[in-house]
Amino acid sequence: MLIGASEIQRIRDYRPRVRPQESVIKAAVSIILRDGEHGTELLMMQRAKHEDDPWSGQMSFPGGKIERQDADSKATAVREAFEEVGAELTGDDFIGQLDDLYGLKINGVFSVHVACFVFKPQRELTLQPNYEVADMVWLPISVLDDRDNAFDYRHPKDPALSMPAVMIDQSKDQILWDLSLRMLANLHELLEWPMQVLTEAEQGVLKDMETRKVSRENIE
């Protein structure tokens, strides 16, 4: 699968749904694309394990909290991409923005509000991960075409909480789930591409994640 000129234009033309609501954390991420041997690839990182990081060990796109010095959420995404993986993104690399996403509600408040920005540099990036990154992978978007990669994931801190997920590399415990998977589901929907790795019912569960509520005791 290749995100070509027509798909890039569709992303450029899209007007994202931006919904400011109360959340514990406000963050922004960069979805960085490149053309690989077998189609479009996305840069993902596996976060280093750290007891103070709520996303410890998880697969994610480069990104992080919006800081006071950031001009806007896109500036946050660009800054975090450089700090975490050494990717120097410019204005020419920017394609567009996807819909804002929210994490689970914890005691009635969204855990995180994420702004999602898409970039496609026309050059090879020199990447240098920092201490926050355990591993990096250029993930072929075609992974989302293979139903065999799907499974039902149990939240590591609340086994009663299950959700659709996609296995990237079982030997490294690299799993695509929750917010990162929802971002790619939004990208597929924008491009009008079927995401064949998940059934329609599973995609419905994914869309409904924002409406699910958990207590803080269950996730701490």
Mark where each language-model region is.
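Amphipathic alpha-helical oligomerization/scaffold segments
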Residues: 149-152
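N-terminal leader/linker segments that precede catalytic domains of diphosphate-processing enzymes
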Residues: 1-61, 65-83, 87-97, 101-125, ...
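Acidic, glycine-rich loop-and-strand cores that form catalytic or ligand-binding grooves
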Residues: 126-144
